[in-house]
Amino acid sequence: MKEEIIKTLKEIEKERDITIIYACEFGSRSWGLDHAKSDYDIRFLYKWNKMSDYLRLEDKNDVIERNKGEMDIVGWDIKKALLLHSKNNPEIREWLISKDIYIEMDKNYFEGFSECDPSVLKQHYTGIINSDLKKKQKGQEDKSLKRRLYDIRCILCWHAIDKGLSPEIKMLDLIGQVDLEDKLKQLILQIIKDHKSQNQTITADDLSFIDKWIEDSFKMMVEKNKKLTYIKKDKEPYNKRFYDIVTGKF
């Protein structure tokens, strides 16, 4: 499959007259939460081959999307990626730390820039759970193991950050970063196993236990988030990096 993915990315390069500078897996596969029928969520960064494409009165589209079979492909122009990185965007962070790489960077385009603000990450992961719980209140709850795993992952990321750690991308590595009671840890591992095998064996009582833990954790996160302070990044280093990339100095 990797060869087919790279072939498709090369086709996009040719069609759009771009150079893909980085490509990775994002989402369930990059987290180690995929199953046999999971799609491939491919994310890439690119730059236009012609400098003139960056020197226009109207901006060119900075997102490229392609759906092909099992592949869901999204690419961001390096200008967009740098801007979002300067704004502490959590998604670009996860792209850059993915361990499932299709095209390696020939140089680190984000070298010298600080990590994503931990406070922004905490709010991001809290917000995902908040959205799910609001749906539950409206009777639109997604009762799948997948949804629970995504909420669990958000909670574990929050706790890792609270310990001063950078959350690991792989779920099993992330579990290792966080202190969990043995019962809770075993239930989470069981949900992962059931989800990956698409064979639910976990009991309704155990799922109720997990659901209550998710809700209790969310309340705690919201309360502690009230004390967060935020770091605003200086955009000038990003502007210089973008200029150097476009002019070929980087």
Question: Where on the chain are the PLM-derived regions?
Answer:
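Short acidic (Asp/Glu) patches
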Residues: V63-K68, I97-K99, D132-G139
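Acidic, carboxylate-rich catalytic segments that either coordinate divalent cations
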Residues: I231-F250
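Short, glycine/charge-rich beta-strand/loop segments that flank catalytic centers
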Residues: W95-E111
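Glycine-rich, aromatic-lined ligand/substrate-binding cores of catalytic
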Residues: I92, I103, W158
